């Protein structure tokens, strides 16, 4: 006895009407991922809290003629400059350390778009923290006026842009570069502290021992090159901008390119 079997035609899935996830939506998801974890959320709160603590200490201990809003804003920028990159590192390395990579790059297979969205989220997060820090600087200035100061509320434009905004944006890219290069949260944080704390000390010692190295240091060490952004009139000269650019290529651009290439090729398990 034989049975007639009707051939089955393979079906197809029509995706022509499916719209791609927008970059704005990807950035919102990445921003939410950064703050949905307890570590990311509380670290962001801790940064703002640390800025407030330092501002209060400065308001109580600083001379009366050094309690202008620009002074408190500069201090806020200095504190953010050290800890903001860690927040960005935690955002970038979450794909590997929290094993989110399989989900992220399944929902958005084009890793370059996901990476750009992550960078955009990092910049938005940094902008939010900077706004809060600027508000905390207002509180510090008011407290300074209560402790004997006569604050000036106007802020030098170079301090605002170079010493506060630009310096912290550079910090975001440094954290992003280290995070993508290592893709491991503890290792990236250790590497960042080695870069931001140990390396400047070593360069300072070598500069003290060798005048020739002292002249070369701003061209090859990014922390040293950025000093004009925080000191003096907050306006680097033409040569100092060239030093910032050269050292930035070494310590920021090259690691970022290598880290991006690694993230685009790494196999998540």
PLM segments and residue spans:
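Secretory targeting signals
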Residues: 4-20, 25, 40, 47-89, ...
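Helix-capping/transition residues at the boundaries of transmembrane alpha-helices
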Residues: 33, 93, 104-106, 175, ...
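A short amphipathic helical element positioned immediately N-terminal to and/or at the very start
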Residues: 23-35
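Residue-level recognition of membrane-helix boundary sites in multi-pass small-molecule transporters
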Residues: 39-42, 100, 113, 187
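Generic structural signal for small/hydrophobic residues in well-ordered secondary structure
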Residues: 30, 108-110, 178, 184, ...
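Transmembrane helix segments
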Residues: 185-220
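Transmembrane helix boundary and interhelical loop/hinge segments in multi-pass membrane proteins
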Residues: 67-71, 88-107, 111-112
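Short cytosolic juxtamembrane segments of multi-pass membrane proteins
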Residues: 264-269
